[in-house]
Regions:
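Nucleotide/pyrophosphate-binding catalytic subdomain
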Residues: 1-259, 264
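Terminal amphipathic helices with adjacent charged low-complexity linkers/tails
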Residues: 35-42, 46-53, 64, 227, ...
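A broad, low-specificity signal marking well-ordered, structured residues that form hydrophobic/aromatic
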Residues: 2, 138, 178, 194, ...
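Generic beta-strand/beta-sheet core signal
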Residues: 6, 36, 141, 180-182, ...
Length: 394
């Protein structure tokens, strides 16, 4: 059994979605197909919600644009009139729900995280119905029923055990071709719609592959695989044939956007290979990610970078030789759900610099200033110094 994930560009045009159909129908094995929203729709859903929140009536035109795009897609790819009629009925119902939510946001000028999560869920809900109707013999399964999250530090995180059991139960008697919306989930306790974050469709596919001990996880995208560098910057970059899980994770963490980083862990534990393939060039070998690369003659696999980096420096003469300062830094940040992806310490031990995302910078500075408030007051340490708008190259 295989799990195939198709991203937004792979379902974003008539050409790409028909290529998806050919790829899936050409599989002899059982396959579970995880799909993202049509390319650009998630961003459009978010932008439209902000217009509605601000009382801007142009949100209605944006909503109608999304409707039209989905209707045009259905009209272009579904020939069977009976199937088309049934699909359009489902899409009409979903858009009526979404229209009501937007109108509510417009009226009361409130957009809570719960409502925002519900709004962005419609992208995958719509695309999965389209793909399930397009692929002959396919059955749609609703990931809201089996991908479960819990709240930690104010953020929704996967409840791995509950989800794994629910996935096994859901697909116990699966059909040969199954279609699943990626990205979306529900809170284990409240049942409210949540999601796995941007790139979460990759994660959905990995979770399912691991729970069902799949033969392989295939990530279908718009590139031939991992490249030795960003081809937009380095024109001589070429596709990497094989990577280890660790190498792929490093490249992903440092800006290679081919695979969402959390995707790797669930399948790595089960030793399930990941293949990154190109929907527009399905005959290309792509990149295979596995536990160990044999006969590896190239110690440096690739170069990647992260834009939007903030470097925060924790400094003070009192830090020299003092045990536990770094523990306090990382504990304080972790308790507030802030991730650190780079650390550098001066040889004299009087300063430690950490890399965080620009979007987390303001909160990180506040957290650390609070953690070391006593030391800052006495002059033993300096207030936190942050430099934003940087890039990390690795």
């Amino acid at each position: 059994m295989k799990v195939l994930k198709f991203g937004g560009t792979s379902v974003g045009s008539v050409e790409s979605i028909l290529s998806l159909k050919k790829i899936v129908e050409g599989e002899n094995d059982d396959v579970i197909v995880v799909v993202s929203a049509l390319g650009g729709i998630t961003d459009k859903l978010i932008a439209t919600s902000k217009l509605a929140l601000g009382g801007d009536e142009s949100y209605k035109a944006e909503f109608e644009f999304m409707q039209k795009r989905h209707y045009e897609m259905v009209d272009a790819i579904i020939d069977d009139e009976e199937k088309k009629s049934g699909l359009l009925h489902t899409i009409d119902r979903l858009f009526e729900e979404l229209k009501s939510i937007y109108y509510g946001v417009y009226l009361i000028h409130d957009l809570s995280p719960k409502i925002q999560a519900a709004i962005v869920s419609y992208g995958e809900r719509l695309s999965s119905h389209i793909v399930a109707t397009l692929v002959n013999g396919a059955k749609r399964y609703n990931s809201l029923d089996f991908i479960k999250t819990i709240k930690k530090h104010g953020k929704n995180v996967l409840d791995s055990e509950v989800t794994a059991n629910a996935v096994k139960e859901t697909f116990r008697n699966r059909t040969q071709k199954s279609v699943v919306p990626g990205f979306i989930s529900t809170d284990r306790n409240t049942g409210e719609i949540t999601n796995l974050g941007r790139g979460g469709s990759d994660y959905t596919a990995s979770i399912i592959a691991a729970a069902l001990d799949a033969e392989v996880l295939e990530i279908w995208t718009d590139v031939d695989g991992f490249m030795t560098a960003d081809p937009k910057v380095i024109h001589t970059a070429y596709t990497i044939n094989e990577l280890s899980y660790v190498e792929a994770m490093e490249l992903c963490n440092f800006g290679a956007k081919v695979v969402y980083p959390p995707t790797i862990y669930p399948v790595c534990v089960k030793n399930i290979p990941i293949k990154v393939k190109n929907t527009f060039n399905p005959d290309s070998a792509g990149t295979t990610i596995l536990s160990h690369v044999e006969n590896d003659s190239k110690p440096i696999k690739g170069i990647s970078s992260i834009k939007g980096t903030t470097l925060i420096t924790v400094a003070g003469l009192s830090m020299v030789g003092v045990i536990g300062v770094n523990r306090r830094i990382f504990t304080a940040l972790a308790e507030n759900g802030i991730s650190v992806f780079m650390v550098s310490q001066a040889s004299s031990e009087n300063s430690t610099s950490i890399g965080v995302r620009d979007v987390d910078a303001e909160e990180a500075v506040a957290v650390l200033n609070n953690e070391f408030s006593k030391e800052i007051r006495t002059g033993a340490m300096f207030p936190m110094h942050a430099e934003s708008g940087l890039a990390t190259v690795a």
